[in-house]
């Protein structure tokens, strides 16, 4: 199993302690945002941590993925298409990690669906995505993005 978690520097020690205590291998990746906007801190918020936890994991060596620990992708600007979500992740970044840690037809789970970047990346890479999002607004954003990307109509299953 591979698990990825985006977090800030304050949560890093807690996640890494949990990982060691639970017997997971881990790696710390950095999402470098070249277009970060200064927000009054002593340094620009131009990185975000992406933690990788793994146990009995799949690795895909030899793909066209970027295996660097420093992943450079511009931040995604808020827009109506992504529901003005405050922490949109670039589809290319998510797709890169999915390529590394899964195979075609694998199942990818995202417990924090947000604007749906993981779902779109899975569609591009022929993976099955199971996603959870509690905020009805962002559920609609995810469905709309998926429908626009695939040209299909989502079906509500109530059972």
PLM feature spans:
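Conserved SAM/SAH-binding beta-strand->alpha-helix loop
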Residues: 135
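S-adenosyl-L-methionine
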Residues: 143-159
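Core catalytic lobe of class I
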Residues: 1-131, 139
């Amino acid at each position: 199993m591979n698990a990825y978690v985006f977090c800030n520097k304050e949560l890093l020690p807690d996640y890494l302690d949990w990982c060691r205590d639970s017997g997971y291998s881990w790696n710390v990746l950095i999402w470098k945002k070249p277009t970060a906007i200064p927000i009054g801190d002593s340094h620009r918020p131009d990185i975000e941590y992406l933690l990788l936890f793994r146990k009995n994991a799949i690795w895909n060596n030899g793909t066209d993925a970027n295996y660097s620990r420093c992943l450079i992708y511009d931040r995604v600007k808020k827009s109506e298409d992504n529901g003005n979500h405050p922490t949109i992740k670039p589809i290319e970044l998510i797709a890169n990690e999915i390529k590394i840690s899964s195979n075609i037809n694998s199942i990818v789970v995202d417990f924090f669906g947000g604007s749906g970047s993981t779902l779109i990346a899975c569609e591009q890479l022929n993976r099955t995505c199971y996603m959870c999002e509690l905020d009805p607004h962002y559920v609609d954003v995810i469905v709309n993005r998926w429908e626009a990307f695939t040209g299909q109509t989502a079906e509500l299953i109530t059972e």
